[in-house]
Curated annotation (Swiss-Prot):
PROSITE patterns associated with the record: G_TR_1, G_TR_2
Family matches, as HAMAP family: Rel_fac_3
The keyword Cell inner membrane appears for this protein: no
Database matches in CDD domains: RF3, RF3_III
Signal peptide boundaries: none
Positions bound to GTP: 18-25, 86-90, 140-143
Source species: Francisella philomiragia subsp. philomiragia (strain ATCC 25017 / CCUG 19701 / FSC 153 / O#319-036)
Domain tr-type G residue range list: 9-276
Gene that this sequence comes from: prfC
GO biological process, one term: regulation of translational termination
Record's subcellular location: Cytoplasm
Protein name according to UniProt: Peptide chain release factor 3
Amino acid sequence: MNDILKEIAKRRTFAIISHPDAGKTTITEKMLLFGNAIKTAGTVKAKKSGVHATSDWMEMEKERGISITTSVMQFPYNGKVVNLLDTPGHEDFSEDTYRTLTAVDSALMVVDAVKGVEDRTIKLMNVCRLRDTPIVTFMNKFDRDTRDPLELLDEVEDIMKIKCAPMNWPIGMGKFFKGVYDLYNDEVTLFEGGHGHEIHPYKKIKGLANAKDQIGADLFDDLEMEIDLVRGASHEFDQEAFLKGELTPVYFGTALANFGVKEMMDGFTTYAPEPQPRETNERLVNTDENKLTGFVFKIQANMDDKHRDRIAFFRICSGKYEKGMKIYHERTGKMMQVSKALTFMAGEREQVEEGYAGDIIGLHNHGSIQIGDSFTQGEKLKFKGIPNFAPEIFKRVKLNDPLKMKALQKGLVQLSEEGATQVFKPMISNDLVLGAVGVLQFDVVAQRLASEYNVKCSYEGVNVSLARWIFCDDEKKLNDFKKKYEVNLSYDGAGYLTYLAPTGVNLQLAQDKNPDIIFSATREH
């Protein structure tokens, strides 16, 4: 039991959230560099050179230079075991990202300091807010001409409704970026360009006054005034407020040049929480219980061309995973032997011998495991809070070869089980409607249907703009509703009744006329 406690105390499981192009994949690479997980960082933009970022591994990602599917990377840092869940930065893959945030204990928010807080980051922060997830912030790209740092803090506080506690402070920006000043240890770290691919021992000077010559007189005078202002106007770091999700420690730097990342990582591994207890429908599960429990938050098909398999990403919530153990599948009521669970390094797979609360392991899945499934060592527990989000874009699927209808249905349902798209079968037609949160997912589905299921399809427009899941406790009212609105009703891939609305006005009218019917934008898996 002591071993379990020791291992849990080491774990830090988190995701990175940001707007596309804020530098998330770059910062991921630098963390792996510091954790000795990779030897040199591949720069993300240089896709054509064959140096692909480690965490972008699906063919389409390599072609387009974006992270589509969530990768999981485990590496050691400062005596801790870091589980980093890399989430898609591209806005088309937000559903996958939202769900990943249910499997972490904290998050790192990367802000492009040139642009400030952007739309996508706001959406992701709102998901973090649902669970009061502790957030660490990294203001990136200070080797470029950025917004004023005080203005950036104000913007985060104003839009994200979270207090900011700057841990260090940038000295200049762009061509005049000289480094950062540690507000708590009175230490200056001086910036030099050109060390993005390696770990470089940047020069440190104890005491702000001792760095005046290196900073330059004019910039130094401005800096002193700015620091006085920051100390007076900003919040001090408070561990309790941070753990409640009320305050975020803020670090400044430039991930591309590998500057400021180490300081942020040191702070993160010090302050971020170890794995936390989790709610189930039956009771609270504590991490130090000796029986294994956990849930599946993602399914990824064909992670490896050689294996043609599907992997369920399983977050351990308590106990210890040991190779070859039998676990109980709560939804099916069956026992299942796990002999070859995997640990990940972005597409590089290794068999895992053991795992503890906070770890993410991969279970081989031949179609029996779904997103949201819970596993235990026998107790009937169902973990809460793994959401399905209503899609925002819809298309009708057109099959090029009508004889392949069965293969198309199978492919669409299997791909929808991964959670990036959803399939709807209207009550009164044989159409298949595909829904997604972003346009790019339709390309991904067409490409994967062709390569994995040998089915060619195309899309056409469909008169649907919103989807809402329908719930009602009164069976008679629900049946009346079904008869009256059958033209708008479909069943999703999991068999849930869904209202597909052509317009927002149509949806509002249906809601107004049916106060006893719940129209929900999310449903639990």
